[in-house]
Amino acid sequence: MAPEENAGTELLLQGFERRFLAVRTLRSFPWQSLEAKLRDSSDSELLRDILQKTVRHPVCVKHPPSVKYAWCFLSELIKKHEAVHTEPLDKLYEVLTETLMAKESTQGHRSYLLSSGGSVTLSKSTAIISHGTTGLVTWDAALYLAEWAIENPAAFINRTVLELGSGAGLTGLAICKMCRPRAYIFSDPHSRVLEQLRGNVLLNGLSLEADITGNLDSPRVTVAQLDWDVAMVHQLSAFQPDVVIAADVLYCPEAIVSLVGVLQRLAACREHKRAPEVYVAFTVRNPETCQLFTTELGRDGIRWEAEAHHDQKLFPYGEHLEMAMLNLTL
């Protein structure tokens, strides 16, 4: 195989691997590239390699996605194979049969591969939005912020980090594993989200602060219930963060006002210390929402600067989405 062709195959396999483990929508997979390669070769080795990178991946075997998702993926893979090959590939049908026989769970897993060779795995409800909260969903801006953090570890090394609206915990878990913070505080207002957050922290080999058996080389990890509208200075003063982060929390005008308010109170808690650095990442869905955010910041005397887009694309998320991140000075 020519070097260029080999590189193309590796990229294709990586595309399937990262999307499948992260349980991305099937339409986001590089199916056209796969079909083109299958037409150029009568060999089924590529399909076997895809199985090894997806349903047979060690991370997937340990932390599988929902049975329904795996079944839909394999069905689509079989369709692509049958469209260009007359001979069936027994291995595909064997794996599909195994999947159909597996017991479905109310929890599925999404895994994200890290540049260190490790991974972050989230155990999540198989429902897209559960119990009236979107906090159980991993939004694309959380992936974008995690990528930026991994590329800029100096912002977090040996520092106390407070995350507002942690949701499923992807960003914080990636920072804890890759950026060596001294302490990390996950926060969210919803009790069901907090319950799942605690589970995800433990699932990824981290210990919560009350666990005296925890790894001393790991950051001190806390999961805190924090409602921006009711949190007073005395509660916030316990956190004393050096860095505050948030991802995809600008979903309505009320949330923007609440966010700016809690940031102001966090700054007031630092007394004679320097105010925390703040990074807010979001998907630009509505320019008016972004404008409202910067207007509210200006009204409260908070300066902001847009962070340059980072280079690495480590996690799979919408390729055509516009992402932004602001660095705020309180």
UniProtKB/Swiss-Prot annotation:
SUPFAM superfamilies: S-adenosyl-L-methionine-dependent methyltransferases. Its EC number is 2.1.1.-. It comes from the Eukaryota. S-adenosyl-L-methionine binds at W139, G165, S166, G167, W228, A247. InterPro entries: FAM86_N, Methyltransf_16, SAM-dependent_MTases_sf. Keywords: Methyltransferase, S-adenosyl-L-methionine, Transferase. One of its GO terms (biological process) is methylation. GO terms for molecular function: methyltransferase activity; protein-lysine N-methyltransferase activity. One of its GO terms (cellular component) is protein-containing complex. The keyword Transferase applies. Transmembrane segments: none annotated. PANTHER family: HEPATOCELLULAR CARCINOMA-ASSOCIATED ANTIGEN (PTHR14614), PROTEIN-LYSINE N-METHYLTRANSFERASE EEF2KMT-RELATED (PTHR14614:SF117). Belongs to the class I-like SAM-binding methyltransferase superfamily. EEF2KMT family. This is Putative protein N-methyltransferase FAM86B1. It comes from Homo sapiens. The gene is FAM86B1.
